[in-house]
C-alpha cells in the first residue's frame, strides 16, 4: 500500500532534518575549557577577552566552564552556543546581570570544584548588592556527577524554585549547599503554566522541564512524559524525543553520529574464521563523549582507541602514516614526567627547591612548566627554601613539553635560558590563560638561548618586559608554528637599535632566519654549513682535523680508518668503504685495522687472512688452520698452535689451586677438632679458661614467684590489644585462705618471640623492686601463653584521678603525692633503674593517700660502670623528656628528674596537658630557646622554683630525688603556705573500706578473706596463720588481736621480730609519711612513729584541724580524746598517706575502666598500651556512671619518622 502524498512529504522532511542534524553532531565545535578557579587574568578587560577567546562559538567544553570577574554591560551572548560541559561550571564574582547559558543541556561533572560541586554559583554581586539577576539555564536537565552550590547571590531570581532532584543524581543530593538570600530587587514570578512553580526566569519559555521525577515507575532513567510509553532509552541523558537510543537529547556515555552507545565501535574485530584480529572499517576513536573517525590535531591515539593529550608511562609518542600514536616501549621508556599541577605536583605553583629533583633525567613533560619568582625567594608558608640556580641544569634533559612553558623569574647572573637549550618541541595542548604556549616575562636575560627549539605546535607566544633581551625579533616564528592561527606578542623588550649599538646581533654565520643568541651555535639555520649544532664557515675537506665530507650542508667526520690526504679529500661518504686511502689495511672494499684472523665464516669455518706488501688482506691456504704469514703452505706456521699449550697450563694451575685449597681446609678442620677436644677436657676438669673480671655489683636477690594457673581466678576482661588481654582477678595462694585482688596480663597465642622477651624483661624489672611507692610484680605463670600477675590499683592512674576529683583535692594531698613519687624515684635511682617514662599517667592510685609508680616498659637497668643509657629508637614521650633525651637519646636519673618536674606540673594544674597545642616536633626548639611550662595558678613561687630547677638544661644542675624528698616533705607539713587553693580546708577525698570496696570492684560476693597484696607480701602479726602446706613463701608472720591490744612482733617461729617496716600494717595509720626527714635519714626503712600529727611544726590556727581518728592510735587507749575524734566532717589531712576522714562511699564504676585497671598492660610499644595508641578505648563518660576509659591522644609519643609525620625519633 503506497503512503499518501502528505505522509511521504512528511517523511522526506524528517529525513532532510535528520541528515543535517547528524552532520552537526559530528562537527560540533569543541573547546578545552579552563582551570583558573578564582584567579583573575590581568585586568577585568583582559580577563573577559580571554574568556571570549576560549568559548566563542564553542558547543562542547572538554574541561571546565569558568565565568568569573565579568563586569556590568559586558556582552556574554557568545555563551549561548554552549550545550555540554564535561567538567564543572563555576559562576563567581560577577556583577553582570544576565549570563545566557540558555542551551546548556548537561554538566557531566568529570571534575569537581572544591572536590564536591559540578555547579557552583558564588558571590555574584558588587558593593551595592546588585549583580547577577538572571541565570536562564532553561535547558539544563541533568548533572551526571557532583552536587550544586549557591551562595551569596543577593540579586539572583527564581533559582530557589528549581527542583534540583530532577537534575542532580540522588547520590549527590546530600552534598547540596543552597544559600538563597532575600532579593533586594523585585523578581518576576514564574509563569502560571510552570509545573510546581519551578522556573529559571519570567516567561513560559523559562519553565523548568521535568524529565525524571514525573516518570512512571517502569522508567529506568529519563522520560518525556508521565506515561510508561514515554520512557527514554537508558543511554539517554537530559531527556529524549522518543524511545530509541537515537532519540536522545544528549548521550549519557558516547555519541556515535546520531546514536548513543555504551562504547565507541572498536578499532579491531576478532575474525573467527582466521582466528585473528582484523581492522574494523566502522571503528572509531573516543574523544570526550563523542566517537570520531579521526582524532583532532595535536592529540595522540592510544592502542585502546582513545584520543589523549599525552601517552602513558609505558609508551612513547610517534608519528605513523600521518597519525601521532602511542607505542609501547621495547624495554625502558624515555622518562616522561608530570608537569606542574599534575600528579605529585598537583599543589605546586612553580618549580622549586623541593620538587626540581623529580625532573632529573626527564625527556618529556606531560603538562606545563612554571618558573615563578616564588621559586627563587622561597616560601616561608610551605617551608620551601630558595631554589639554587645551579639546580636548573636538571632541566637540560627536557626535549618536549606537551603543555606550555611559563617563565617569570630567572637567575640574575644567567644571560639566557640555558636550562632549556635542548628543548625541541612545545605542543601547547594546554595553554596559559587559554592562549599562550610560550611565555617569557620580565626577565634579566639578554638572549633566549632556545637553540634546539624546532616546533611550537599550538598556542601563541608572548615575550614581554625583558629589558635586556635582544635577538627575539630575529626569529622566523611562523616556521616554528604548527597552525596558521598562531601569533606572537613580542613587546617591551630592549630596542633593536640599542642591541645593534652594543653588537648584540646574530653571528655572521647565521642565515636570515634569525638566531637565539650571539654564538654560532645559536643560529636557527646556518648561512654556509654546520658541524653538529654549530655553524662554521667551511668543512675540513682538504686540511684540518678531523677530516670531513659534506652532506646536506652538514660537515660529517670521515671514518677513523680513512687515511688523511694532503690537499685532497679523505673520504666521499660515511663508513670505512668510502675512504680514498686506508690508514691500515684493505680487506675487499673496506678499510680495516687488522686482517681477519680466526673469524667465523660460512659453513662454520674459520677465516684467516694475511697482509701483503701493499697492506691488502688475502686468504690463507685452506690447510693453514691456525693462520699464516704468506701465500701457500709455506706461509703456514711451523710451531703449531699455541692454544692447546695455553689450555694445558690453565688446567694445571686450576688443579694446583684445588689441591692447595683442600690442604688448607683439612688443616683448619684439624685445628678446630683439637681446640674442641681441649675445651671439653678443660670443662670436665672444671678449670677456669678466662681470668676473673668481677664487677663489684651486688647480686640481685629478688624473688620471682612462679604461680600455677590454678592459683588465680580471672573475673573480668579489663582490656585487650596487640600483646594480648588484661584481666582483673583474684590470686588465691595454694593452701591459704586469702584472696588477693590482682591484674593478670596474658599474651596472645601467636605473640612474637620479641614480645615474649620484652614482657619477661619487664617482669625482671618489676620483680627487682620492693618499695611502698613502686608497683611490684606478684608472680609469673609460664603457661603456653606467658601471664604476669601484678597488684591491682583500685583508683586507676593519678592523671585521671586528679582530673575527676579536681574540685575535692586539697593542698595536703598534692604535696604528699609529690613526696611519695619522689620517694619511689629515689628508690629506683638507688637500684640503678632509669624509668624513662615518668608521668602522671604512669602513677597509680592505691588509695587517695597512697600512690605508686608503674609502667616499666621503657625502664632500663644500668650496669655497674654505666652512668647513662643511649636509646636506639621507638616511641617516646617527647613533652615529658629532658632536652638531652630528645636531641641525643641520652637517659639518666637526672633526665627522670626533668620528667618528675613535668609530672608535678600536671598535678598542680589538675591534669592539664603540658605544652598543649604545640606540636611535639617543635618541643626541642622551644626548650632550647628557654621556654618552659608556665607557673600553675595554685603554686607559690617556692613550688614553681623547684619545677624550674628540674628543667635546667645542664643535667647536673637539677636537684637529686633525695633533695626533692626533703623539699616537698617540708612543704607537706605546712601545705597551705605553699599551695593556694580556694576552699582548701573543706576538701576531702573518698576512702572506701577494703571489704566493701573490693566486693564492688571484683563483682564477687564472698570477699571476707580479701587481702591487699602488700599486706600479704609483708604480713603482720597474726595476720595469717601461714600453714606449712603453703608453697608460696611469706617474708614474716605477725599476729594482732585488736587495735587496742598490746602488740608483740613475732615471726613464724614465735620469736620476737622487730622493727616494723615502713608502710606496714601497724603503721598504716601513722603520721605524715614525710616525717622530719633529713638527707641522712631518707633511706632509713624503719622510722620511729611520732605520737602526734605534724608534731614538728606548729599547727595552723584556721582550717587545719587534724583528724586523730586513726593517726598514731596508741596501743592502749588514752583516757581522753580530741574533741574532733571520729568527726566525719573534719577536713584534716594530717596523714598524707593514710586518711580515713569520711564515711565509705560507693565505688564508682570507673573502676571497670581498662585505663585505670590494666596496669598499663604490656609496656611494649604496641596497641596494648593505651597511652601509646590512639582510639583504643572510647573516651567519654556516660551519664549513668559507666566510664569509658580515655584513650591517650599521645602525640607526645612519637616513633622515628620523617618530619612531616606526627612521629619523631627518640
Swiss-Prot record:
EC number(s) reported in the record: 2.7.10.1
Q: Impact of altering residue 704 to A?
A: Abolishes phosphorylation
- Tissue-level expression: Ubiquitously expressed. Isoform 2 is also expressed in ovarian cancers.
Q: Where are the compositionally biased (Polar residues) regions?
A: 1104-1115, 1128-1137
Result, substituting residue 719 to S:
Found in a lung cancer sample; somatic mutation; strongly increased kinase activity; constitutively activated kinase with higher levels of basal autophosphorylation; more sensitive to gefitinib than wild-type
Cite a single Pfam family from the UniProt record. GF_recep_IV
**Outcome following mutation: residue 834 to L:** Found in a lung cancer sample
In this UniProt entry, the residues modified to Omega-N-methylarginine are 1199
Keyword Signal applies: yes
Sequence positions bearing Phosphothreonine: 678, 693, 1041
Protein name, entry field: Epidermal growth factor receptor
Q: What is the lineage of its organism?
A: Eukaryota, Metazoa, Chordata, Craniata, Vertebrata
Q: How does it sit in the membrane?
A: Single-pass type I membrane protein
Q: What class of enzyme is it?
A: transferase
Where does this one sit in the cell?
Cell membrane; Endoplasmic reticulum membrane; Golgi apparatus membrane; Nucleus membrane
